[in-house]
From Swiss-Prot:
InterPro entries: Fe-S_cluster_assembly_SufBD, SUF_FeS_clus_asmbl_SufB, SUF_FeS_clus_asmbl_SufBD_core, SUF_FeS_clus_asmbl_SufBD_sf, SufBD_N. It comes from Staphylococcus aureus (strain MRSA252). SUPFAM superfamilies: Stabilizer of iron transporter SufD (SSF101960). This is Iron-sulfur cluster assembly SufBD family protein SAR0880. Belongs to the iron-sulfur cluster assembly SufBD family. It holds the Pfam family SUFBD_core. GO terms for biological process: iron-sulfur cluster assembly.
């Protein structure tokens, strides 16, 4: 029976369920735990070797000395693997009842029926439900949970796995590489264009839980795909860790849009590595919504490797009481005539802290490259703070770089104008915030835009967490 979490008001994601897992590893990170995960999944020897090497790297690498405070993150107090069911089901009726009730509340079956080409639902460490329209399979599209792709498409999987984000990239990429479980694997063949999105939903249910999904997307030459992920967790008094890795390969003339709407509870550390390689005339779009969490550190990255490659990041971050949103983007121009755009919208309230942290790099071969950066922050009270930390590296003098940053508060004139028309101060402030984030929400499919606006309203009311 679902339990109501404390102090979540109308926040529909704040509930948690009784433990329904069929296997749960001991807390703490050891070689035995890593071997146990690999053994439970019946993985090939090369993957176990990869995991063990990654674990050694994790032990050797220092914690980041920049960004948010990670001093309270205790790796020995985390459960690294929870298996909720025997297998990923293709029929919703076959999903275990407790888990099904959770996703029913979150609207996953309804969403699939209405407007999705395929959907995947991950609960704790494993995907429990996965389905895709039959005609997409007939076109050669692969959309599977990552564990199944390793077993069923090993040659393709091995070719691309860890090619964009190696284990040595950073400490949390090494951690993910050692204990990864679940995530999505997508391959879209040459010249195949998906008109409707694929979606994955990630849910942490347990206390002191670590979720470490690994997502790998390959858009072959001339292909296009839109992938949407949603993330939530219940409210607990102790911390959980979400540390995902996302790798995307955008081949010549291909197009990928990756949309994230995360709404973690305020006890979750969200430490994610997302990167894409974009080849000739390819186009990569990150649309990134960051709400909730205790601390988010996330900087979607485009490495523009082919002439004419394009990359863009459109992000929103909302930090409330006790929250730090340290987010931004990285654009690495390695080829001529590449272009990138970063638009960052940040809101802080009730003492929350938002940080834009970005890197734009122009390599020696990036002749004719151009980048445009726009950072806007809206601070809603005197206790909240905002920082903008851009870092630009230029090794070619034939490039164009524009950067605009703006920090503002809700003006008395705006409030007076709206209130003089019979609107309350609370409603007026909400309207101003909604107008501020409109460039983000207009890029979402309608159903997601409605949900995003609702989540922002909850944040404005202080009812999340």
């Amino acid at each position: 029976m679902a339990k109501k979490a404390p102090d979540v008001g109308d926040y529909k994601y704040g509930f948690h369920d009784d433990d329904v897992s069929i296997f749960r590893s001991e807390r703490g990170l050891t070689e035995n735990i890593v071997r146990e995960i690999s053994n439970m999944k019946n993985e090939p020897e090369w993957m176990l070797d990869f995991r063990l090497k990654s674990l050694k790297l994790f032990y050797k690498m220092p914690m980041p000395q920049w960004g948010g405070d990670l001093s309270e993150l205790n790796f020995d107090d985390i459960t690294y693997y929870v298996k909720p069911s025997e297998q990923a089901e293709r029929s919703w009726d076959e999903v275990p009842e407790e888990i099904k009730r959770t996703f029913d509340k979150l609207g996953i079956p309804e969403a699939e029926q209405k407007y999705l080409a395929g959907v995947s639902a991950q609960y704790e460490s494993e995907v429990v439900y996965h389905n895709m329209e039959k005609e997409l399979e007939e076109k050669g599209i692969i959309f599977k949970d990552t564990d199944s792709a390793l077993q069923e498409n090993e040659e393709l999987f091995k070719k691309y796995f860890a090619s964009v984000v190696p284990a040595a990239d950073n400490k949390f990429a090494a951690l993910n590489s050692a204990v990864w479980s679940g995530g999505s694997f997508i391959y879209v063949p040459k010249n195949i264009k998906l008109d409707t999105p694929l979606q994955a939903y990630f849910r942490i249910n347990s206390e002191n839980m670590g979720q470490f999904e690994r997502t790998l997307i390959i858009a072959d030459e001339g292909a296009s795909v839109h992938y949407i992920e949603g993330c939530t967790a219940p409210v607990y008094t102790t911390s959980s860790l979400h540390s995902a890795v996302v790798e995307i390969i955008v081949h010549k003339d291909a197009h990928v849009r990756y949309t994230t709407i995360q709404n973690w509870a305020n006890n979750v550390y969200n430490l994610v590595t997302k990167r894409t390689f974009v080849y000739e005339n390819g186009n990569m779009e990150w649309v990134d919504g960051n709400l909730g969490s205790k601390l988010t550190m996330k900087y979607p990255n485009c490495v523009l490797l082919g002439e004419g490659a394009k990359g863009s990041t459109l992000s929103i971050a909302f930090a409330g009481k006790g929250q730090v949103q340290d987010a931004g983007a990285k654009m690495i121009h390695k080829a001529p005539n590449t272009s990138s755009t970063i638009v960052s919208k940040s809101i802080s309230k009730n003492g929350g802290k938002v940080i834009y942290r970005g890197i734009v790099h122009f390599g020696r071969k990036a002749k004719g490259a151009r980048s445009n950066i726009e950072c806007d922050t809206l601070i809603l009270d005197n206790e909240s703070t905002s920082d903008t930390i851009p870092y630009n590296e230029v090794f070619n003098d034939q490039i164009s770089l524009e950067h605009e940053a703006k920090v503002s508060k809700v003006s008395e004139e705006q409030l007076f104008y709206l209130m003089s028309r019979g609107i309350s101060e609370e409603e007026a402030t909400e309207m101003i915030v909604m107008g501020f984030i409109e460039p983000f929400t207009k890029e979402l499919p309608m159903e997601y835009a409605v949900e995003m606006n609702r989540l922002i309203k909850f944040e404005m009311e202080g009812s999340i967490g």
